[in-house]
């Protein structure tokens, strides 16, 4: 996954990360309002501790696609994100 100079690739990468994380959560029978973006990053072959992931995570939050759920944690102890209505719309984009 790489950002393109025009920035369109960055949005696409963030959307792909959100979609993969959401689909993983649904397939696992988990709460469909929550997404583990770190696990989604690993599914995409991305380092969940890397700078690229951190930038995509910030992008997802700034765009309002997901927000931190301070009462839930993922397997690594990080905050799980709650997907928003805007995020669900992004996941549903073709």
Where would I find each of the regions flagged by the language model?
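Short amphipathic alpha-helical interaction segments
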Residues: 46-63, 78
């Amino acid at each position: 996954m790489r950002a393109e100079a025009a920035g369109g690739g960055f949005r696409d990468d963030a959307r792909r990360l959100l979609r993969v994380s959401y689909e993983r959560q649904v397939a696992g029978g988990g709460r469909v309002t929550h997404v583990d973006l770190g696990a989604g990053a690993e599914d995409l072959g991305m380092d969940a501790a890397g700078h690229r992931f951190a930038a995509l995570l910030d992008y997802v939050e700034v765009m309002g696609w997901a927000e931190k759920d301070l009462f839930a944690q993922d397997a690594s102890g990080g905050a799980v994100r709650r997907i928003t209505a805007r995020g669900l719309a992004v996941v549903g984009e073709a």
